[in-house]
């Protein structure tokens, strides 16, 4: 049993969830936790993992939502995460929904949150990220400002995109949080295609400008150049199979780098936590172990429908190396975690990666890539 689980977690879990989260970020920012683990997070068993033009030290990233405002990126990377995704950030700074808005369900090893994209705004976060450490693959997750109606969503996303483009290694488009009114409407085919087409057009323009290449010289028929920022879309776990397949088709048409599967769920079936207690928590997205199978099923659908052509970052209910391995076999080539990190502590990334490397060897795989999609025949 780790020091975190026996000593630190009971203290943090005795506090209101968001207070504990803020305290944890402050501890991380001091470097104490990462200093303890530094030098103990070598993952040479994997070799480098190359996806959408980026090189990852290991497959496990930290999902958006933990470090919304990019205040502890280097310290989080030092804990052994192969990449860190900050945000969700919006063009307009916003306080999010009223507190309390983050709740623990220890019996289910889950969280319910209705944060509502509380963040300092894309401009402030982009300025902070200019100082990001070299070597840490950094994703920035962008969402729609609450005050902006869906009819003006494209321009709102474009403004955030332009601000974070110079500082992000990849950009994730969040259209799936259940905590911003009507946001999930943007997952519908016509709205999503319009949004992603506009972002990719701006992506090409910004990349060509930064590379000193004029659009006329670059040409319009070329596939994504290496200097374009990889663009991914983060989707909900509560979609039907046909809706997922439609998003896959759009993603392929718009030459997206991949899909992040999945965000939190609004479904609360089968929880161990008493129903009255859950009801009293109010609305919000559920994450953690209850989401695991649902997100794995979405990963499998994406992999099968795209015939393995569309990279998937699998997220939802990863607590153990076995959970991670299951998502790899379903079709994920990279992984993210959030709730598992909250429950397992500072050694979480190290433990998952070591366990995953061991599992791959035991199952006879020579590399992680060899295992991708093996349980989801195309």
Predicted regions span which residues?
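A gly/proline- and charged-residue-enriched helix-loop-helix capping module
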Residues: 87-136
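An N-cap/entry alpha-helix motif that binds or orients negatively charged groups
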Residues: 3-49, 113-118, 122-123
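Intrinsic, low-complexity polybasic segments
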Residues: 205, 209-213, 219-221, 225
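C-terminal helical cap(s) of enzyme catalytic domains, especially alpha/beta-barrels
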Residues: 94-109, 270-284, 342-365
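Active-site glycine- and acidic-residue-rich loops that bind
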Residues: 145-158, 184-185, 191, 232-253
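Catalytic cores of alpha/beta
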Residues: 69-78, 239-251, 308, 318-335
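Glycine-rich phosphate-binding active-site loops on the catalytic face of alpha/beta enzymes
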Residues: 82-94, 175-177, 258-266, 318, ...
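Glycine/Thr-rich beta-alpha phosphate-binding loop at enzyme active sites
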Residues: 25, 29-30, 36-43, 178-191, ...
